[in-house]
């Protein structure tokens, strides 16, 4: 059975056909609409899936935000242009006339990345560092989403009580500091207004402020990982996302994690499926029908 998998992120929308063998075909992308209106997202999703839906038997959505009863509830509305709520399952069922499931994108990615690990591992945490910071927890070989869909939203744990206000309403969240948006927001002077990709490029060229911003992000993530180890005693942490997979970033995180006491050390791995983990995880979960 072929699944039409959709990944809704803060920067882009992606869709692909995924067969029972896990192979990705006909992958497509569109920019995420920067609009507070649900119609803008509906229109973008319609354009994205219309060329693919005739070739699928079901739809699986991986989306940023809390997924509860098939709807997207934005924990940080800034990640979707200010959109607070969107009926994901209902909308895609209307657009495609296909049975549809939805799950948080980082939770979906965690499940895909778990499948790629050594068979002896039963407990892992996935972290995505991109527009925001998200996560997914696999414990005892099972994906943990929580009764309200909040499990794994580790980007909204505290990093600095005196830090910037996060879009979720808390002060000093990991996401507000370590994410691509957090890196860009903290930039000053000639880097003011630059996005995270530009800041990484400038860091590679020796720009001191850019390097400091990236080190600040990596240090914050390392402290988060130490907290995760203390909370879950996971066997490994897998890091993905556009920032997490940027050249040299994971090595920086490893350097800062090594400065923590040994009890909080844990193996760090780069995401095996890289930017396709959300799509694959959603399809795998649909195939397993465990949601």
Swiss-Prot record:
It catalyses: an N-acyl-D-mannosamine + ATP = an N-acyl-D-mannosamine 6-phosphate + ADP + H(+). GO terms for biological process: N-acetylneuraminate catabolic process. Signal peptide: none annotated. HAMAP family: ManNAc_kinase (MF_01234). Its EC number is 2.7.1.60. This is N-acetylmannosamine kinase. Transmembrane segments: none annotated.
């Amino acid at each position: 059975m072929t699944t039409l998998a959709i990944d809704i992120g803060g920067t882009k929308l992606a869709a692909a056909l995924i067969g029972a063998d896990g192979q990705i075909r006909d992958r497509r992308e569109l920019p995420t609409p920067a609009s507070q209106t649900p119609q803008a997202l509906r229109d973008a999703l319609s354009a994205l899936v219309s060329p693919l839906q005739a070739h699928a038997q079901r739809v699986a959505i991986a989306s940023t935000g809390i997924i509860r009863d098939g709807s997207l509830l934005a924990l940080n509305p800034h990640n979707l242009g200010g959109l607070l709520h969107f009926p994901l399952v209902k909308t895609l069922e209307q657009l495609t006339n296909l049975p549809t499931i939805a799950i948080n994108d980082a939770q979906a990615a965690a499940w895909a990345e778990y499948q790629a690990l050594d068979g002896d591992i039963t407990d892992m945490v996935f972290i995505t560092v991109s527009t925001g910071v998200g996560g997914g927890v696999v414990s005892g070989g099972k994906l943990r989403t929580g009764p309200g869909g909040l499990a794994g939203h580790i980007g909204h744990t505290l990093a600095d009580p005196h830090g910037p206000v996060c879009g979720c309403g808390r002060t000093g969240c990991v996401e507000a500091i370590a994410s691509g948006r957090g890196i860009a927001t903290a930039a000053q002077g000639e880097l003011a207004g630059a996005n995270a990709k530009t800041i990484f490029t400038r860091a590679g060229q020796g720009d001191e402020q850019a390097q400091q911003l990236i080190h600040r992000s990596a240090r914050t993530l390392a402290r988060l990982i130490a907290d995760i180890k203390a909370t879950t005693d996971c066997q490994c942490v897998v890091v993905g996302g556009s920032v997490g997979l940027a050249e040299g970033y994971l090595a920086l995180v490893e350097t800062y994690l090594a400065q923590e006491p040994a009890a909080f050390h844990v193996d760090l791995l780069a995401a095996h499926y890289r930017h396709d983990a959300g799509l694959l995880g959603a399809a795998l979960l649909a195939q397993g029908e465990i949601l």
